[in-house]
Amino acid sequence: PLSITEIAYSKDTKNVILGWNSIPGAAYIIKYSTDLVNWDNDLDDGITSDGDTTSRTFTLSDFGLDSLPMVFFRVERDDTN
């Protein structure tokens, strides 16, 4: 099953690294929520897997998320691509 296998955060750079198990050639969407209820916001979509595992780095300030006390992430398979 799809699951996040790596989460790393740097306070200095405001970067978060997300890694997950993936299927070669599949596409994925990374979504975020501030309340675990609303998952309408994408960090990125149409991410093509890197193979059996995939990871991406995001700068939270690029999305206005660096000042929030908590942010939650999830990865979904993008079956539209």
Describe each region flagged by the PLM.
Residues 1-81:
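Short, composition-biased motifs enriched in small/polar/acidic residues
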